[in-house]
């Protein structure tokens, strides 16, 4: 049997059949587009809900850095911050907490945070800026200013009495910036320069690393990895790369760590058991299969309307394989128009 090259003929038949049924094709394209809009909206809304949930979690956690290496010495901090696995890092050094009746119902922390750390803790000034090194400046939120009875004005002077590892001290500061108060955030912060924090340690006689609470004056390294899928695993790998561990506090190479539980992807990846994985896969397959059935039924109705045309083609010798190719080409062309149109419409509607 001779093999005849008839791909061009099949293409022309498919295109001419489409041109002969313009109204039907417009309806088919609209059906595909509307189905695509439906699923675009579904997935985008799901992602928006997840993002809102994460943001709420971050505020409860106190920030959105991936993980934390806690209570480090300066040497440990210098070692870990240059780890290639870490894409960004931020430094935080705790100084103390304000005392007095005004602060009895508020959790306020005074300390140094670099620009990255301040950003991750939602401490981005809406007026002014973060404090400069070598100055007596401080930045805080509007709630702390309200507790102090201070009007939010750049350059305003205020005095704060606070506890530094059991030693009370009173210090004066110049307001250099402030940000809005967020009730969802657990802790309020008063940020001061690193030089001022170290000066306060010296004034109260605190030697970093020898604080009674084990926390004041230490270096806390908050980090961001390339992604948030396996935060706990990545934190432990960083420790292992430098000969440390976070499981046995009795060992000399122990470093305390924290993992940001606000990331839903990390929670899912770290606790994903076979049953959960199957359930997630089943839901995704169901959604995809539902979309396939909707579009398939639209094309099935279109093909049924042309049954006489395909019968005539079969009578004159067109094989079933060739008929399938004609129908597949039509489906492909209509999908190439309908799916991008649906994606554009879906994304446009969501951003209105």
Where are these regions (language model features)?
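N-terminal Sec/SRP start-transfer signal
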Residues: 1-39, 328, 332
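Short amphipathic alpha-helical coupling elements at transmembrane boundaries
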Residues: 16-20, 54-58, 312-315
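Alpha-helical transmembrane segments
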Residues: 24-26, 34-62, 300
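Hydrophobic positions within alpha-helical transmembrane segments of bacterial inner-membrane proteins
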Residues: 36, 291-292, 297, 331, ...
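Basic-flanked hydrophobic alpha-helices used for secretion and membrane insertion
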Residues: 47, 51-267
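N-terminal membrane-entry
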Residues: 270-287
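Interfacial "coupling" helices/loops that link adjacent transmembrane helices in transporter permeases
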Residues: 293-334
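Conserved small/polar residues in nucleotide/adenosyl-binding loops
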Residues: 351-352
């Amino acid at each position: 049997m001779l093999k005849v090259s008839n791909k061009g003929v099949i293409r022309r038949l498919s295109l001419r059949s489409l041109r002969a049924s313009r109204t039907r094709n417009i309806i088919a394209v609209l059906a595909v587009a509307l189905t695509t809009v439906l699923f675009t909206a579904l997935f985008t809304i799901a992602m928006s809900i997840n993002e809102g949930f994460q943001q709420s979690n971050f505020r409860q956690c106190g920030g959105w850095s991936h993980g934390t290496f806690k209570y480090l010495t300066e040497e440990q901090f210098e070692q870990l911050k240059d780890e290639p696995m870490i894409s960004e890092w931020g430094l935080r050094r705790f100084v103390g907490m304000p005392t007095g009746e005004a602060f009895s119902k508020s959790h306020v922390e005074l300390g140094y945070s670099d620009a990255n750390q301040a950003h991750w803790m939602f401490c981005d000034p809406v007026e002014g800026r973060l404090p400069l090194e070598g100055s007596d400046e401080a930045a805080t939120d509007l709630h702390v200013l309200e507790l102090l009875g201070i009007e939010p004005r750049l350059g305003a002077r205020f005095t704060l009495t606070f506890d530094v590892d059991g030693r009370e001290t009173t210090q004066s500061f110049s307001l250099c910036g402030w940000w809005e108060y967020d009730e969802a955030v657990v802790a309020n912060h008063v940020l001061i320069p690193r030089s001022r924090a170290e000066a306060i340690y010296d004034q109260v006689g605190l030697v970093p690393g020898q604080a009674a609470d084990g926390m004041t004056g230490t270096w806390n390294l908050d980090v961001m990895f390339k992604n948030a899928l396996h935060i706990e695993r990545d934190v432990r790998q960083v420790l292992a790369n430098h000969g440390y561990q976070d499981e046995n506090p009795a060992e000399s190479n122990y470093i305390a760590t924290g993992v940001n539980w606000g990331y839903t992807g990390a929670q899912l990846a770290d606790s994903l058991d076979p049953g959960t994985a199957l359930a997630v896969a089943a839901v995704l397959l169901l959604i995809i299969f539902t979309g396939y059935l909707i579009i398939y039924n639209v094309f099935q109705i279109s093909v049924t309307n042309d049954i006489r045309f395909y019968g005539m083609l079969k009578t004159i010798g067109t094989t079933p394989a060739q008929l399938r190719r004609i129908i597949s080409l039509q489906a492909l062309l209509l999908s190439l128009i309908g799916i991008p149109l649906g994606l554009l419409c879906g994304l446009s509607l969501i951003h209105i």
